[in-house]
Design a protein with these regions (language model features):
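Beta-loop-alpha module in the N-terminal Rossmann-like domain of NAD(P)-dependent dehydrogenases
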Residues: 59-125
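Glycine-rich, aromatic-lined ligand/substrate-binding cores of catalytic
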Residues: 202-284
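N-terminal Rossmann-like dinucleotide-binding module
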Residues: 1-55
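Hydrophobic residues in well-ordered beta-strands that form the structural core
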Residues: 108, 133-135, 278
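C-terminal helix-rich "cap/oligomerization" subdomain common to oxidoreductases
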Residues: 1-4, 333-385
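C-terminal glycine/acidic-rich active-site capping loop/insertion
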Residues: 212, 239, 244, 273-354
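A short helix->loop->beta-strand "cap" motif at the edges of active sites that frequently abuts
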Residues: 57-58, 102-104, 129-131, 248
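Predominantly a Rossmann-like dinucleotide-binding segment in NAD(P)-dependent oxidoreductases
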Residues: 132, 139-232, 286, 377
Length: 385
């Protein structure tokens, strides 16, 4: 196969936020082209979106079930190779399940499902079908996050003792859903978002970042979950104490009522030799701190970075790289892995470095454990899956 991968999309219609981000990211490296979509539960909106994206109307579908049924009848090379699912949380599992069962590989926006049970079922289907699966935890795509991961993997800062990860936003400080704002309305609705609000929306990103960078797994939690805004049905703020499988302790907080904050996700990790710090709002910089010497400043695009980080840099040092490029790294790695798989060849080094179903299951377990802990009077709870 010497061609671009054909991508279909479920969700991401006009006025949606994340669908356009996925399309731009998928397009950045030239390995993927959008060929079809079921962009909305409203057939007219789906059709209008297809027109805006210059798609043939015969490849714009009223439902995702129609799309999967029709696309699999087309010859390989013309039909979609994989589908990107960018719907609200309650519409993740069924499209992903049906796509896999119809022979399509899947890229899925997080969280992986509506419940932990659904996530486990999805894993069974992936294993049964042998199809490829990517979960878009965006922040693992940043080059300096990967540099932090490599520094820890090589034991440069020693045995990990403390992990702090935070994700403050401020956009839900007021009762925005009461005004009918689209993003706020579904994200604060238990029927569409699930049992968690902020902890499901951004807490899962912080949790995934902590486990990805450190290479550790959370084993115990103690959560304090709060709803600050009157009338809101789900949590908008929370703090979680963490215990890791090497004995390290940590803290995670995720809030969407920190007035004035934007998307300030940040991680600090401390070992017995040194520590490191990265934050998305200065994404090209990684601080490495030492017990007995000055702080070192690592910059994206520099020649001294690890091979893993360098593979995920796109521009020379000093040229900003950000959210879209991090997203694109996930799509690029998935695409090159899938092309190699389809050609029965070996994928380029580092291309397997993207989140999958295991990260999805742990993310859903995080949500369910945190909400259970927040409702409990117990000091600590085991992190159960």
């Amino acid at each position: 196969m010497n061609r671009k991968l054909n991508m279909g999309m479920v969700g991401g219609g006009k006025d949606a936020f994340i669908g356009a981000v996925h399309r731009m990211a998928a397009n950045l490296d030239g390995h993927i082209q959008l060929v079809c979509g079921a962009f909305s539960s409203n057939p007219t909106k789906s059709s209008d979106t297809g027109k805006e994206l210059y798609l043939a109307q015969s490849r714009v579908y009223a439902t995702y079930t129609d799309m999967f049924a029709q696309e699999k009848l087309l010859p390989i090379g013309e039909r979609m190779d994989f589908v990107s699912i960018v719907t609200p949380n309650h519409l993740h599992f069924e499209p992903a399940k049906l796509a896999l069962e119809n022979g399509f590989d899947v890229v899925l926006d997080k969280p992986v499902a509506f419940t932990l049970a659904e996530a486990k079922t999805l894993k069974e289907i992936i294993n049964k079908t042998g199809k490829s699966f990517c979960l878009t935890h965006t922040y693992t795509g940043y080059p300096m996050v990967k540099e932090a991961k490599e520094i820890i993997r090589e034991n440069k800062i020693g045995t990990i003792k403390k992990v702090y990860v935070s994700y403050p936003q401020g956009w839900l400080t007021t009762f925005l859903e009461g005004d009918g704002q689209k993003q706020a309305t579904w994200r604060t609705d238990p029927a569409k978002s699930g049992i968690a609000g902020s902890m499901g929306d951004i807490g899962t990103h912080a949790f995934n970042l902590a486990e990805y960078v450190t290479g550790l797994q959370v084993t115990k939690i103690c959560a304090d979950i709060t709803t600050n805004v009157a009338g809101r049905k789900l949590d908008d703020d929370g703090t979680v104490l963490l215990k890791f499988n090497n004995g390290a302790s940590g803290m995670l907080y995720a809030t969407q009522v920190a007035a004035g904050e934007e998307n300030n996700i940040r991680i600090q990790v401390y070992g017995d030799k040194g520590g490191l710090e990265w934050k998305q709002e200065d994404a090209n910089t990684l601080l490495v701190k030492w017990l007995d010497k000055p702080v070192e400043i690592y910059r994206a695009g520099s020649s001294y970075l690890s091979p893993l980080a360098s593979f995920n840099c796109r521009t020379p040092a000093g040229h900003p790289e950000g959210y879209l490029e991090a997203f694109a790294n996930l799509y690029r790695n998935f695409a090159l892995s899938l092309i190699a798989k389809n050609n029965s060849t070996e994928a380029p080094e580092f291309c397997s470095d993207y989140p999958g179903i295991e990260e999805g299951i742990r993310g859903m377990a995080f949500i369910e454990n945190v909400i259970a802990s927040g409702k409990s009077n117990d000091k600590w709870m085991d992190f159960s899956i």
